[in-house]
Curated annotation (Swiss-Prot):
Gene3D superfamilies: Nemo cc2-lz domain - 1d5 darpin complex. One of its GO terms (molecular function) is polyubiquitin modification-dependent protein binding. The keyword Coiled coil applies. This is TNFAIP3-interacting protein 3. Residues 1-30, 84-129 are annotated as: Disordered. Binds to zinc finger protein TNFAIP3 and inhibits NF-kappa-B activation induced by tumor necrosis factor, Toll-like receptor 4 (TLR4), interleukin-1 and 12-O-tetradecanoylphorbol-13-acetate. Overexpression inhibits NF-kappa-B-dependent gene expression in response to lipopolysaccharide at a level downstream of TRAF6 and upstream of IKBKB. NF-kappa-B inhibition is independent of TNFAIP3 binding. Keywords: Coiled coil, Inflammatory response. Residues 27-265 form a coiled coil. Residues 17-28 have a biased composition (Basic and acidic residues). GO terms for biological process: cellular response to lipopolysaccharide; inflammatory response; MyD88-independent toll-like receptor signaling pathway; negative regulation of canonical NF-kappaB signal transduction; regulation of transcription by RNA polymerase II; toll-like receptor 4 signaling pathway. Highly expressed in lung, lymph node, thymus and fetal liver. Expressed at lower levels in bone marrow, brain, kidney, spleen, leukocytes and tonsils. Could be detected in heart, salivary gland, adrenal gland, pancreas, ovary and fetal brain. High levels detected in liver, colon, small intestine, muscle, stomach, testis, placenta, thyroid, uterus, prostate, skin and PBL.
C-alpha cells in the first residue's frame, strides 16, 4: 500500500512538470488492468477445471461403490442358497458320503469367498482413503479458489482506490504552487545531507578506532620483537662464552694429559713397569720418612684415583669380603 501511495505521489510530481508523463499514465493503468484481468481469467479457468475433476472422481467412486455392493449381495445370496441346499441334503442318509464331499467343497468355496470378500473390503478401504485424499485436495483447492477470489476483490478495490486517488490528485494538482514544491525539495535535500553527514561521522569514528587499535597492536608486536631479540642476543653471548670455556677446558685437559705422559714413576712390587707419580706423595729430602710416619688416608679417594699398589690392596680386601661375608 505504501509503495502504491509513494508511486502515486511521484507520478503526480512528474505530471506537474511535463505533459508527456500525463499521456503515459493512462497506458500504464491500462496495462495494469489488462494484467489483472488475465490473472482473474486464469484463476477462473483453474477453478472450473478443479470442479470438473472433483465431479469426475465423485461419479467414479459412486459407480465403484454400487458395483461392490452388488457383488457382496450376490455372494451373500449364493451363500444362503448353498446353506439351504446343504440343509436339505443332510436329511438323506444314503448320500452322506457325497454330503461330506460337498461339505468340504462348500467349505473351500466359503474360504475362497471369504478371502475374496476380504480383498474387496481392503480395496474398498483403499478407495475410501483415496476418496478422503481427493476430498482433502478438493477442500484445499476450494480454499485456494476462495483466496483467489479474495485477492481478485482486493485487486479490484485497490484499482478503484487508485483510480479515485489518481482522479483526486489530477483534480488538486493545479492548486500546488511552484514555491511550495521548491521548498519541499530544498527541505528534503537538507534532510538527506544531514543524514549523510551523520553516516559519514559514524564511519570516520569507526575508521579512527580501527586505526588506533591497529597502531597499538603494531607497537605491542614491535616491543615483543625487541624483547625477543634481546633474549636471543643474551642467549647467543652465553652460548659463545660457554663454547670458549669448553675449548679452554679441552686445551687444559690436553695439556695435563701431555704432562702426565711425560711423568714416570720408579718400579714397585706391583709388577708394573711404569708408575704415575702420586700427586699426594711428597717429594724432596725427608719426604719418605714423613710418609711412613704419616701414611695418607685413602678412605676418601675413589678407587680409580688410588695408587696402583693401594688399588691392589683394596681389590684384595674386597675379594676377601666377598668370600667371607
Amino acid at each position: 500500500m505504501a509503495h502504491f501511495v509513494q508511486g502515486t505521489s511521484r507520478m503526480i510530481a512528474a505530471e506537474s512538470s511535463t505533459e508527456h508523463k500525463e499521456c503515459a499514465e493512462p497506458s500504464t493503468r491500462k496495462n495494469l488492468m489488462n494484467s489483472l484481468e488475465q490473472k482473474i481469467r486464469c484463476l477462473e479457468k483453474q477453478r472450473k477445471e478443479l470442479l470438473e475433476v472433483n465431479q469426475q472422481w465423485d461419479q467414479q467412486f459412486r459407480s465403484m461403490k454400487e458395483l461392490y455392493e452388488r457383488k457382496v449381495a450376490e455372494l451373500k445370496t449364493k451363500l444362503d442358497a448353498a446353506e439351504r441346499f446343504l440343509s436339505t441334503r443332510e436329511k438323506d442318509p444314503h448320500q452322506r458320503q457325497r454330503k461330506d464331499d460337498r461339505q468340504r467343497e462348500d467349505d473351500r468355496q466359503r474360504d475362497l469367498t471369504r478371502d475374496r470378500l476380504q480383498r474387496e473390503e481392503k480395496e474398498k478401504e483403499r478407495l475410501n482413503e483415496e476418496l478422503h485424499e481427493l476430498k482433502e485436495e478438493n477442500k484445499l483447492l476450494k480454499g485456494k479458489n476462495t483466496l483467489a477470489n479474495k485477492e481478485k476483490e482486493h485487486y479490484e478495490c485497490e484499482i478503484k482506490r487508485l483510480n479515485k486517488a489518481l482522479q483526486d490528485a489530477l483534480n488538486i494538482k493545479c492548486s500546488f504552487s511552484e514555491d511550495c514544491l521548491r521548498k519541499s525539495r530544498v527541505e528534503f535535500c537538507h534532510e538527506e545531507m544531514r543524514t549523510e553527514m551523520e553516516v559519514l561521522k559514524q564511519q570516520v569514528q569507526i575508521y579512527e578506532e580501527d586505526f588506533k587499535k591497529e597502531r597499538s597492536d603494531r607497537e605491542r608486536l614491535n616491543q615483543e620483537k625487541e624483547e625477543l631479540q634481546q633474549i636471543n642476543e643474551t642467549s647467543q653471548s652465553q652460548l659463545n662464552r660457554l663454547n670458549s670455556q669448553i675449548k679452554a677446558c679441552q686445551m687444559e685437559k690436553e695439556k695435563l694429559e701431555k704432562q702426565l705422559k711425560q711423568m714416570y714413576c720408579p718400579p714397585c712390587n706391583c709388577g708394573l713397569v711404569f708408575h704415575l707419580q702420586d700427586p699426594w706423595v711428597p717429594t724432596g729430602p725427608g719426604a719418605v720418612q714423613k710418609q711412613r710416619e704419616h701414611p695418607p688416608d685413602y678412605q676418601w679417594y675413589a678407587l680409580d684415583q688410588l695408587p696402583p699398589d693401594v688399588q691392589h690392596k683394596a681389590n684384595g680386601l674386597s675379594s676377601v669380603k666377598k668370600v667371607h661375608p
